[in-house]
Amino acid sequence: MPRLKRDDLPDAATQTAIRGRGILCPFSSAAEARMVKHILVAHDLSPDADLALRRAAQLARQCNAQLSLAHVCEADEQAAGEQLQAHLDQLGLDDVRLWLRPGPTVEGLLTLAGGIEADLLVLGRHHRQSPQGFAGTTLERILLATPIPLLLVTHPAIEPYRQALAALDYSRCANRALHAAWQLLPPEAKLHALNIEEVAEIHGADPAALALQVELFGQLIDDTRTALGADEGRLSYSLHQGERLNCLDAAISELQPQLLALGGHSRSELSHALLGSLTRHFFDNPPCDVLVAR
């Protein structure tokens, strides 16, 4: 898997041509880097939802954010509310606002998220038993419709996140995902941004193309570090050539992140009604908690 660092740069003429193209970081730092102030966790009375609640509670404490718990159902609201309140009391979460909403899950949850101005939506892996996996589930419909980042929690919140990995390209949604992930990390945690120049592995590496990509991506990372106030020790990066999934799987194996951040759109971003293949793959087979922004 070919890999270059920024020391391996194009020649002077190529660098001049790159700068002349006016490559800019495609996001508004003020909007993308906003702090997490209100976390909404959806709970369906399942063990998977308990994982999400515990992680959301840890993040709320870390970020000094308000935590709300939502249950949307068409059955007995009172019984569900009593069960959830007892569960919150058992966990010692006495400062959590409990919301009970009737009606369709997706509409009820997203309407509530907008009404309380939530910055982050947290869910468990409710589609684990679905024969179709992630496809066609309530979780997929929520992800397709939510305007705020969504965190899929799959592992126990034993400790704060220590290592995050962001698949970063030049799309706005990938940049939003990286910024959202950064806000969920404590000061001692690290984030690694991975850029992949997709080529068929049978064709081998193209050193000239990869060197050009190093310069472009390096500019993006410099802008991102400035926006986040991050240094090289906390926000690192690397570039790879190869097939996207293979490169990302290799990075996950090497870094062992507790959090994976992805942009939610298809690569063309032509349609907000489409999800990228990487997002679908990792929601079906999450190696860790997965954060998606659209």
PLM feature spans:
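Gly/Ser-rich helix-loop-strand patches that form or flank binding pockets
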Residues: 4-8, 16-28, 32, 108-158, ...
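Short helix-capping segments at alpha-helix termini
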Residues: 88-94, 227-232
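Short, well-ordered secondary-structure micro-motifs
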Residues: 133-134, 177, 202-206, 247-250, ...
